[in-house]
């Protein structure tokens, strides 16, 4: 991506999402030791156009605080990196993972931290999850949410509005609503894009603008997400 790079930091997740577009990714080939990241780190060092690194997976927060801290230290030593973005579902499904050590690691880094969580329904944002998200926000971390539009789960104005409000109430910005990626075994979750467009139009009538996520789709070969207008 222009100005950005993505690194698969871990091959495991705390939960198996049936609609995940990386469900068949060869995670067994991913680095298991810190030195195994060195080729990727060297590539980052040599490309001064990259100012933001995305840690993805799997789930980066499946790494221990110690291992994640070692990786962040190496990233901090790359002078042209300015921001660290972590894509994770852990604060939603395993909120105790948001430890004091993790918060200190993120907020004391010279890299500006951004955490993108993944919640699809307000029923996921329960008390423990709310507390974990508030801890991140109050520590000064920018926290965004991305959701997937799923038939029978959140394909109604009420469900999407409730999700946005539950996130906004704890300081998390609804960022993206993804059209389902067509992965094997997930066809029953797919919502017609015209339905998605109507849902977004209704959300705009009901919610303040900042609480309405962008409706987007991943298209193979494109260098960015495509907004569904």
Report the location of each language-model feature.
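Hydrophobic positions in the central parallel beta-sheet of the AAA+
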Residues: 7, 53-55
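Conserved AdoMet/S-adenosylmethionine-binding subsite of the radical SAM
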Residues: 38-52, 61-207
């Amino acid at each position: 991506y222009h100005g950005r790079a993505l690194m698969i930091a871990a091959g495991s997740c705390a939960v198996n999402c049936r609609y995940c577009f990386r469900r068949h990714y060869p995670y067994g080939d991913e680095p298991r030791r810190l030195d195994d990241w060195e080729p990727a780190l060297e590539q980052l060092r040599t490309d001064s156009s990259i100012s933001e690194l995305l840690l993805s997976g799997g789930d980066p927060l499946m790494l221990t605080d110690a291992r994640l801290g070692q990786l962040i230290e190496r990233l901090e030593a790359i002078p042209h990196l300015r921001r660290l973005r972590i894509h994770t579902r852990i604060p939603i499904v395993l909120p105790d993972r948001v430890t004091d050590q993790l918060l200190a690691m993120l907020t004391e880094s010279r890299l500006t931290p951004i955490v993108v969580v993944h919640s699809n329904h307000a029923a996921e944002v329960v008390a423990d999850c709310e507390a974990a998200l508030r801890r991140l926000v109050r520590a000064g971390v920018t926290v965004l949410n991305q959701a997937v539009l799923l038939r029978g789960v959140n394909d109604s104005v009420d469900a999407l509005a409730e999700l946005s409000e539950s996130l906004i109430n704890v300081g998390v910005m609804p960022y993206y609503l993804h059209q389902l990626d067509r992965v094997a075994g997930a066809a029953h979750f797919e919502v017609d894009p015209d339905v998605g467009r109507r849902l977004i139009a209704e959300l705009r009538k009901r919610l303040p603008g900042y609480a309405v996520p962008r409706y987007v789709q991943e298209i193979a070969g494109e260098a960015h997400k495509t907004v569904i207008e």
